[in-house]
């Protein structure tokens, strides 16, 4: 992936939820199974071109890093196997220098690799603090290789597009 200078203009929590359905949760002797789902969305912020400091050559994009972590425990003492569900949509507003000189693929790479790479540590901290405040050990998510994730999803999209041509 070639490097492009991205500028972040703001970052924020857009949506957040923590569920602790078995509170007070009786700790199990078994370690919980933790399932983490990650999704990334990008949206060009329409109408920003006429605002001060923003031009069509450098439009703003909102990148949303959506992480959901669900912990389950198989224990006969607990009627519902859900220990907790923590979900955060963490966003950033980005612009890319020399936007008009880049191919569509280069822009997608900058948005779907560079954006989430910047946002992830902040979302990770929110999840760790929240699970700790919920009475659990802090959930420290492993780092995510967003470049590999992007490449895998691009390959899947190409495969499904080529498969759709067969009758």
Curated annotation (Swiss-Prot):
Compartments, record wording: Cytoplasm
GO cellular component terms, A-Z: cytoplasm
Entry annotated with the keyword Plastid: no
The keyword Nucleus appears for this protein: no
GO MF annotation: an example: unfolded protein binding
Alphabetical keyword list: Chaperone, Cytoplasm, Protein transport, Translocation, Transport
Pfam families (UniProt xref): SecB
Superkingdom of origin organism: Bacteria
An example Gene Ontology biological process: protein tetramerization
Summary of the function given for this chain in its UniProt record: One of the proteins required for the normal export of preproteins out of the cell cytoplasm. It is a molecular chaperone that binds to a subset of precursor proteins, maintaining them in a translocation-competent state. It also specifically binds to its receptor SecA.
Family: Belongs to the SecB family.
Subunit structure: Homotetramer, a dimer of dimers. One homotetramer interacts with 1 SecA dimer.
Protein name as catalogued: Protein-export protein SecB
Organism: Wolbachia pipientis subsp. Culex pipiens (strain wPip)
């Amino acid at each position: 992936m070639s490097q492009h200078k991205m500028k972040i203009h703001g970052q924020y929590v857009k949506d957040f939820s923590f569920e602790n359905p078995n509170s007070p949760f009786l700790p199990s002797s078994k370690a919980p199974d933790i399932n983490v789902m990650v999704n990334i969305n990008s949206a060009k912020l329409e109408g920003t071109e006429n605002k001060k400091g923003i031009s069509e050559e450098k439009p703003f994009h909102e990148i949303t890093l959506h992480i959901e972590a669900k912990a389950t425990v198989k224990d006969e003492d607990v009627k519902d196997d859900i220990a907790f569900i923590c979900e955060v949509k963490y966003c950033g507003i980005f612009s890319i220098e020399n936007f008009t000189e880049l191919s569509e693929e280069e822009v997608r790479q900058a948005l779907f690799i560079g954006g989430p790479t910047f946002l992830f540590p902040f979302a990770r901290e929110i999840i760790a603090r929240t699970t700790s405040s919920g009475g659990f050990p802090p959930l420290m998510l492993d780092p995510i290789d967003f470049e590999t994730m992007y490449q895998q999803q691009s390959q899947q999209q190409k495969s499904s597009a080529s498969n759709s041509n067969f009758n």
